[in-house]
Amino acid sequence: MSTSIPDVAVHDSPAVAAPLRWVGMDGIVVPVQLTTADGGQHVIGRARAQIDLPAMEVKGIHMSRLYRLLDTHAVEPLTPVGICGLLSAMVNSHADCASTAARVDWHFDWLRRVPALVSNDLSGWRGYPVSLRAEYSAVHVQFWLCVEVGYSSTCPCSAALARQMLADAFLQEHVEVSALSPETVADWLRSNGSYATPHSQRSVARIEVALTEQAVELGLPALVDCAERILSTPVQAAVRRVDEQAFARLNGANLMYVEDATRRLQHGLAIHYSAFRVHVRHLESLHPHDAVASTVDE
């Protein structure tokens, strides 16, 4: 009985000789260590790890090598500085495949405790979907951090239509009244202010920013704070009625189409980030489809 274990990837030849741009694994379950000014955090994520395969005569790469490298790196905080070493090691591990490029993507949810808008003693958890893409080659190293920020958007057109209907209803009911006290008007508004309401919806801004390879942290709190400050109506966690009332006021003060939200982000992000991509989606409550807009500044 033979004691040698066959290695088809090494000893067999491909049926069709051709270079491959990327080869590797996707959906790898990995622990992710995050370090921020808010403190450290351990979350569960999924990763994709790939290298190029320029050697046409090589049947396949050694995926177990990539897995072990990714597993070893998982004990370190996720930072561009540390990832550079991982990418370089991935390429070096496949010198027998003539590999010159590597890339890894991570996907996970970043958890953050956020305070209520008004209630000082109330807070709750928010989860932000995050992805980090790192790509290494002989000519460049690129890092893109992406986060999804949820917020509320109220349609400006719908708000104008609702105001008109409310005004018309008020005039129709008081057409023969020459003078009204402020208290009477206030009572009427309390009873009839919802005669027509504008449509609003949960919305999502997907924001990607470029990171430098020297960065020692991802900068998630700063990016999320920047986006939520620009949009002004981030979705909330724990609320009381006073917080919900404050949220309604913010929505009324920040009416926006999908175009408005995208332009706001474009203007505000340009102050802090040299390269970014924005994709905005409003999950319309009026329509069965979404409104979308995007912009790029690279």
UniProtKB/Swiss-Prot annotation:
The protein's enzyme class: hydrolase
Statement: the UniProt record of this protein carries the keyword Hydrolase: yes
InterPro entries: GTP_cyclohydrolase_FolE2, GTP_cyclohydrolase_FolE2/MptA
Function as written in the Swiss-Prot or TrEMBL entry: Converts GTP to 7,8-dihydroneopterin triphosphate.
Signal peptide interval: none
Pathway annotation from the record: Cofactor biosynthesis; 7,8-dihydroneopterin triphosphate biosynthesis; 7,8-dihydroneopterin triphosphate from GTP: step 1/1
Family statement: Belongs to the GTP cyclohydrolase IV family.
GO molecular function: GTP cyclohydrolase I activity
GO biological process: tetrahydrofolate biosynthetic process
Keyword vocabulary terms for this entry: Hydrolase
Transmembrane segments: none
Residues the UniProt record annotates as site (May be catalytically important): C155
The encoding gene: folE2
Official protein name in the record: GTP cyclohydrolase FolE2
EC number annotated for this UniProt entry: 3.5.4.16
Disulfide bonds: none
Pfam families: GCHY-1
